[in-house]
Amino acid sequence: MASEMIVDHRQKAFELLKVDAEKILKLIRVQMDNLTMPQCPLYEEVLDTQMFGLSREIDFAVRLGLVDEKDGKDLLYTLERELSALHDAFTAK
């Protein structure tokens, strides 16, 4: 039972991190669609702040043993790729 609870906590922690990553992607989409251009300092600051916050969340979860370091890095890498593709699509308009 204890190992099931540990697995459940690990799964829940990773799911919460994925939700936070998706929130960042949605926030940047809204910003690009409605508010600012990717070259705008406000856009860059929001993106940097959000990515830094997520990286700290992931680091904390890794240190607690709730998320594997590789999985955390993969999550950040995937988000960075998605944001890059979004940026490229926006600037190609």
UniProtKB/Swiss-Prot annotation:
InterPro entries: UPF0358 (IPR009983), UPF0358_sf (IPR036270). It holds the Pfam family DUF1507. Essential for cell growth and for normal cell shape. Belongs to the UPF0358 family. NCBIfam families: PRK13666.1. This is UPF0358 protein YlaN. It comes from Bacillus subtilis (strain 168).
